[in-house]
Curated annotation (Swiss-Prot):
Role: Catalyzes the NADPH-dependent reduction of N-acetyl-5-glutamyl phosphate to yield N-acetyl-L-glutamate 5-semialdehyde.
Keywords of this entry: Amino-acid biosynthesis, Arginine biosynthesis, Cytoplasm, NADP, Oxidoreductase
Subcellular location: Cytoplasm
Recorded metabolic or biological pathway in which this protein acts: Amino-acid biosynthesis; L-arginine biosynthesis; N(2)-acetyl-L-ornithine from L-glutamate: step 3/4
Entry-linked InterPro entries: AGPR_type-1 (IPR000706), NAD(P)-bd_dom_sf (IPR036291), NAGSA_dehydrogenase (IPR050085), Semialdehyde_DH_NAD-bd (IPR000534)
Descriptive protein name: N-acetyl-gamma-glutamyl-phosphate reductase
Molecular function via GO: N-acetyl-gamma-glutamyl-phosphate reductase activity; NAD binding; NADP+ binding
Family named by the database record: Belongs to the NAGSA dehydrogenase family. Type 1 subfamily.
Length: 333
């Protein structure tokens, strides 16, 4: 018997990707999966891509997760904290929701509402010292999908004194799976295909998370819904502090990071190259007219932006090589 793993909230897109990764992981044994509306259904009927996975979804409650060594929480924002508080301290927990990402209760109230549950260790291993913090805890808050792409692009530039922390501007496009699996009129094919539409302009909930993780002091973020199932492409711009090669700064920061790839000069990220992988692709330059630093970041919002990153964090928590059970390469086209 390997490491016993349970997934709470297994019926959604992130939950389905978690199940795919867990069942292919050489050290993990899936012992439980839970859901609300889909409880009582076999996993392979809820997720047709998991043909032959006969485990039946249980109701989401602590008893269903009691036999697990490792629990992934893929629940809507506001639901993870209550369930996590009822799990034994020795159980390792990775929360893919937002409940434990923010340190500031006022930021939580402004962007999410409700009671602030407190902060867990932030699960972005590539930040300085973060692998060690993740390895030493039993509770990890997985970053948001947009935050993953943007923090990886921006954090090294601010940390190196190459970019000003103020006046950061981001425009990022995401596939429709980022909005979840629940039926919504604006996400049906007839609405999404052939269209680009911004949403939560100037008030996206990942803004305080990005500022917290990068040290940015002001951030203008415009998210865009793109006509594709999955993937994120973020363009991050910042004011330089000094004459600097942003690509060189990023390359040095991620020289030993197996899942972050600073592309050769002249090659720019595109989402299809990252699909199915836990990788983030980066490229950077200086705007010849405005003089601003530009970093483009691409990743799979369900992989590196959710389930893949959660497994990477779990590997570190368990003392396993962080690449175990994860792909560096995408499946394009």
């Amino acid at each position: 018997m390997g490491i016993r793993v349970a997934v709470a909230g297994a019926s959604g897109y992130a939950g389905g990707e978690l199940l795919r990764l867990i069942t292919g992981h050489p050290e993990f044994d899936l012992v439980a999966a839970t859901a609300h509306s889909q409880a009582g259904h076999r996993l392979d009927t809820v997720h047709p891509q998991l043909t032959g996975l006969e485990l039946v979804l249980a109701e989401t409650d602590p008893a269903a997760l009691a036999d697990a060594d490792l629990v992934f929480l893929a629940l809507p924002h506001g639901e993870s904290a209550t369930l996590a508080a009822q799990l034994p301290p020795k159980v390792r927990v990775v929360d893919l929701g937002a409940d434990h990402r923010l340190a500031d209760p006022y930021a939580w109230a402004n962007y999410y509402g409700g009671t602030h549950a407190g902060q867990w260790t932030y699960g972005l291993p590539e930040l300085p010292g973060q692998r060690e913090r993740i390895a030493a805890t039993t509770r990890v808050a997985n970053p948001g999908c947009y935050a993953s792409a943007i923090v990886l692009a921006l954090a090294p530039l601010i940390a190196a004194g190459a970019a000003q922390p103020a006046d950061v501007v981001v425009v990022a496009a995401s596939g429709a799976s980022g909005a979840g699996r629940a039926a919504k009129a604006h996400l049906i094919a007839g609405e999404v295909m052939g269209d680009l539409s911004p949403y939560r302009v100037g008030a996206h909930q990942h803004v305080p998370e990005i500022k917290q993780a990068t040290g940015a002091t002001s951030l203008s973020f415009t998210p865009v819904l793109a006509p594709m199932p999955r993937g994120i492409l973020a363009t991050v711009t910042a004011v330089p502090v000094r004459d600097v090669d942003p690509q060189a700064v990023l390359a040095e920061a991620y020289a030993d990071a197996p899942f972050v790839h600073v592309l050769p000069e002249g090659r720019w990220p595109h989402t299809a190259a990252t699909l199915g992988s836990n990788s983030c692709h980066l490229q950077a330059t200086v705007d010849v007219d405005a003089g601003r630093l530009i970093v483009v970041s691409g990743l799979d919002n369900l992989g590196r932006g959710a389930a893949g990153q959660a497994v990477q964090n779990a590997n570190i928590m368990l003392g396993l090589p962080e690449t175990t059970g994860l792909s560096v390469w995408g499946v394009s086209p």
